[in-house]
């Protein structure tokens, strides 16, 4: 039986291809792209309970909560199509938790999406700014001025 974790002489052992591995590689590419644009990465894979933020970055004075979606370029779903209404709700709750944990309620914030398409080991990244608008999340959330700072009251 073939052991996918065995070390082959003269070659690095590699983990089998997995969704988690592809996602992690996409997040690496996304972080590198943002740093290359002069952004400062404040947190990666930040968690609060079951909530997670892929990347929390700073562009100028603005905090940016970045969701990263990585997909096969030849697949049926494009990366941006994976950002559903349910995912947007979870991102908002995660951002509120991050703002509370870091006493950053007075900071301007926004949500961006980095789409990573993979084809034959090549990664193509695209940044989409402001993927969550005030109209997307409705009025039942305490979000202050839409794209500005989210306030808990």
Q: Which residue ranges define each predicted feature?
A:
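Structural motif
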Residues: 50, 63-65, 108, 125
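Short acidic/glycine-enriched loop/turn segments that link adjacent beta-strands
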Residues: 48-51, 121
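Residues at secondary-structure transition points
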Residues: 17, 21, 25, 50, ...
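Domain-level recognition of nuclease-like catalytic cores that cleave nucleotide substrates
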Residues: 101-153
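Catalytic cores of nucleic-acid endonucleases
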Residues: 11-12, 70-120
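Conserved catalytic cores of phosphodiester-cleaving nucleases, focusing on short active-site segments
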Residues: 34, 53-75, 91
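Acidic-basic catalytic patches of nuclease active cores, encompassing PD-(D/E)XK
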Residues: 1-44
